[in-house]
């Protein structure tokens, strides 16, 4: 059974079981173990399963096998627990669920940061000369939204739309290499008077950017 099938089966069974858990005496040791089991599932495992599924549905990203194996281990534990109707070693289930969440979230955030780094970098440059800086901020925020965990379907949808708009905007950004290098220095607060070559000065004046460009004065 694939992990996607395991996730679907597990969530369906858990939904049914949770609706009946109140039938167990609330004060019993069994109830305490059950409550801990459900708390761990709802707080740690379910958000991970949901976000994992969303990522797989919206990207071709492959999570590290170690993290996937730990997630499978948690799913197998849930299935076994529900089949046996007895909660055992719930503390281990908690540790494994937290571990799976941490490893999967760490891997995804690192990947999302990497695949959005270049366009966010370009938007940072474009913002320096844009007439609509708030729009650039909005687009950047939407794109950064997928670099979170647990990531949601809405964040993916917002990011996809923002990427399309951003790419179209960036097509209008036509600078030669000297100007682009200069703007990146300005963005990083590393531009100095020495960077003001004659072509750069002419470009600034021709575009009325005198009030937009800030330089660093190094002593």
What are these regions (language model features)?
Residues 196-204:
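Low-complexity, intrinsically disordered Gly/Pro/Thr-rich segments
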Residues 1-196, 209-210:
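Amphipathic alpha-helical assembly segments used for oligomerization, scaffolding, or translocation
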Residues 214-219:
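C-terminal edge-of-domain segments
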């Amino acid at each position: 059974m694939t992990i996607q099938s395991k996730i679907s089966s597990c969530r369906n069974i858990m939904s049914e079981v949770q609706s009946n858990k109140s039938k167990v005496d609330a004060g019993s040791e069994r109830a305490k173990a059950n409550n801990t089991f459900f708390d761990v599932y709802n707080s740690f495992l379910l958000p991970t399963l949901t976000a994992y599924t969303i990522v797989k549905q919206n990207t071709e990203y492959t999570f590290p096998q170690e993290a996937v194996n730990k997630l499978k281990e948690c799913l197998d534990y849930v299935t076994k627990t529900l089949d046996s109707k007895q909660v055992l070693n719930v503390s281990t289930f908690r540790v494994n669920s937290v571990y799976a969440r941490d490893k999967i979230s760490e891997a995804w955030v690192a990947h999302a940061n990497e695949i959005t780094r270049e366009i966010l970098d370009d938007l940072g440059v474009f913002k320096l000369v844009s007439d609509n800086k708030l729009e650039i901020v909005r687009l950047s925020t939407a794109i950064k939204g997928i670099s979170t965990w647990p990531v949601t379907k809405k964040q993916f949808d917002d990011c996809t739309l923002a990427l399309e708009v951003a790419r179209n905007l960036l097509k209008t950004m036509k600078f030669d290499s000297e100007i682009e290098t200069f703007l990146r220095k300005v963005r990083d607060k590393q531009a100095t008077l020495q960077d003001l070559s004659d072509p750069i000065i002419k470009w600034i004046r021709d575009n009325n950017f005198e009030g937009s460009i800030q330089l660093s004065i190094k002593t």
